[in-house]
A protein has these predicted regions:
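Phosphate-binding glycine-rich loop
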Residues: 5-52, 66-68, 76-78, 100, ...
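PLP-dependent aminotransferase class I/II
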Residues: 10-18, 25-26, 89, 93, ...
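Structural detector of well-ordered beta-strand residues that form the stable sheet scaffold
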Residues: 29, 54, 75, 134-135, ...
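Short, conserved catalytic or interaction motifs in soluble domains
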Residues: 33, 79, 166, 194, ...
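PLP-dependent aminotransferase-like
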Residues: 43-129, 133-138, 145
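Conserved active-site segment immediately N-terminal to the catalytic lysine
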Residues: 136, 140-171, 187, 213-218
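Active-site PLP attachment segment
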Residues: 155-199, 228
Length: 367
């Protein structure tokens, strides 16, 4: 607050560099939300009318909306019942069908749900076979790793997106970032972030020598900029990122142990990955408890436990139903949704509070 800049100052590139360096990417483009980051990522990859983008139905709506913002069509690939991420098998089947009708997507957006990394090596191999680009939606996954590398390295994707919303692993109040190791994509995202404007002489169009042109709008962009105040907060959060994730894993390990005796399924951990552990989702064994998901959810709420549902399949939202999507489109995602409840997961969750959560779950599961 005592600096000369509230926005468009030195803290933004410093934060971008800190995140990119941590993740092992060459460039970071900070924006005002992960939604904006997904949008500029689609724009940078040339997504537009006539194109298709595929993503997971088990995600927040922004993972799909970014395609629509760009004028493209969106479709969904069902999830793996163990990881809750996009199923590689279903993706391969859908791609083969699309190839037969010349409708392979331009971009696929795998979502690292709850911080658990997708099988990016397999998805990348399919991208090489079928010719699509990849945007990793890692909104839940900063601080996680896949095959020993930080999520965000972009080894298996063109662009990776992080979220810094207040409920995420680190926060800037509101904010997001798109990472890439491609300088052309980075420059395009910088332009789309700020009205499609550039101040770089080498990118400007020729003008009469007696006219002063400090900047030019060379494309249609948005005002998606992050402020210096937000970036300063982000820099302070980055210092504690590994600590936050370590604490989340300790909380998850305690949950794993405490929930063993209850009729629920706890989150699976991939041996190839290290989750950012944004969420801890239990699946109810409904055939054993003889209670509905709503019964359990409402009981926990009544007991003061801050539970949530992640996620209603995107295509079940009324807006998407008006586009023609119907119930049953992704059976695994719908079965998961009917059984899933997210229980409290945050670094300040004490052992005592965790015990209270378990007691409340035990009570809620009983008829």
């Amino acid at each position: 607050m005592r600096s000369d800049f509230l926005t468009q100052g030195p803290k933004v590139p410093a934060f971008e560099q800190a995140v990119a360096s941590y993740a092992g990417a060459s460039y970071g483009v900070a924006v005002n939300s992960a939604t904006s980051a997904l949008h500029i990522a689609c724009r940078a990859l040339g997504v537009g009318p006539g194109d298709a983008v595929w993503t997971s139905p088990n995600t927040f709506v922004a993972s799909a909306n970014c395609a629509l913002y760009s004028g493209a069509e969106v479709d969904f690939v069902d999830i793996d019942p163990r990881t809750y991420n996009m199923s590689v098998d279903r993706l391969a089947e859908k791609l083969e069908q699309a190839k037969a009708t010349n409708s392979v997507p331009k971009v696929v957006i795998p979502v690292h749900f709850a911080g658990q990394p997708c099988d990016m090596a397999a998805i990348h191999a399919l991208s090489q076979q079928y010719g699509f680009q990849i945007i990793e939606d890692a909104s839940h996954a900063i601080g996680g790793r896949y095959k020993g590398e930080p999520i965000g390295s972009c080894r298996y994707s063109a662009i990776t997106v992080f979220s810094f919303h207040p409920v995420k692993i680190i926060t800037t109040g509101e904010g997001g970032m798109a990472l890439t190791s491609d300088p052309v994509l980075a420059e395009r995202m910088v332009q789309f972030r700020s009205h499609g404007i550039t101040s770089k002489p080498e990118l400007m169009h020729p003008r009469p020598v007696d006219e002063i042109w400090n900047y030019q709008q060379i494309d249609l962009g948005n005002n998606y900029r992050m402020t210096d105040m937000q970036s300063a907060l982000g820099l302070s959060q980055m210092v504690r990122l590994d600590e936050f994730v370590t604490v989340r894993h300790a909380i998850a390990a305690r949950y794993d142990e405490l929930l063993k005796a209850l009729p629920v399924t706890t989150p699976w951990r991939s041996p190839d990955g290290y989750s950012g552990m944004h969420l801890y989702v239990i699946r109810l064994k409904l055939d054993e408890i003889h209670r509905t998901q709503r019964d359990v959810y409402e009981s926990l709420r009544e007991q003061g436990v801050g539970v949530n549902l992640h996620y209603i399949p995107v295509y079940r939202q009324p807006y998407y139903e008006r586009m023609g999507f119907k119930a049953g489109y992704c059976p695994e995602a719908e079965q998961y949704y009917r059984e899933a409840i997210s229980i409290p997961m945050y670094p300040g969750l004490t052992t005592e509070l965790q015990g209270q959560v378990i007691d409340a779950i035990d009570k809620a599961l009983k008829p």
